Amino acid sequence: MSMLAAMMVLAGASGSTPAPDVLMRNYMTCAVSTREPQMRLLLDTKADEDYRAAALSVTDVDKCARSDAAVTAPLLAAFGPERGKFRGMVAETLLKRSTTVRKLAALPQVSSYTAGWFAFTGRPQAVDEMAMCVAATNPGGIITLLGTKPGSTWQRQALTALTPSLGACLAKGYQLDTKPAGLRAALAEALYHRDYYVSVPGRGS
């Protein structure tokens, strides 16, 4: 087993998804159903003011909020240290509504990957570059991953199966120390951007 595979197996053995993450995922599902354009803007924007406006627009979805924490959590997550995980949850929720993602073909790997949305994720650029590369070369592997329950044995197995793609796409010399939840989020967002920009003619990353 490679060092990368061993790291992911050990990191994924921590157990079930924490309750706050479950709450946030439920909120995202509800918010997307009522504010899909704003939720997409959170992922697509390349301007700070647009990002803030999009985050503010989903804090007042009253029927989605079951506590004060649920109301404020999206805004805090959109700008805090958990920004990357938050964006990944939004991406996963939007991908569930996609009619095209399963039609994406694996593409040959290219020498570099870059996109305007990297600046808003809060992740190391090398992680987003890797995720974008995997979304291009192995979209099916990410789809399998996103079909698993976060924190489950199935997720761990899906991540292990993705190890060759992750290794091939990771920048030489970069030490990947991202936890499974963060890795899942990065891959989900990268796949969302590939699917959305392929699905909407004239859009670019």
Question: Which residues are covered by each model-predicted region?
Answer:
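Sec-dependent N-terminal signal peptides
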Residues: 1-12
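N-terminal Sec/ER secretory leader and immediately downstream segment
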Residues: 14-98
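Extended amphipathic alpha-helical regions
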Residues: 17, 101, 105, 120, ...
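Short, low-complexity cationic-aromatic patches
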Residues: 20-25, 32, 121-130, 135, ...
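Extracytoplasmic/secreted envelope proteins and their assembly/folding machinery
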Residues: 25-28, 36, 127-131, 139, ...
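Short, tandemly repeated low-complexity microdomains enriched for cysteine and small residues
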Residues: 39-52, 142-156, 202
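Extended amphipathic alpha-helical interaction segments
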Residues: 86-151
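A cross-kingdom marker for long, charged
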Residues: 157-205
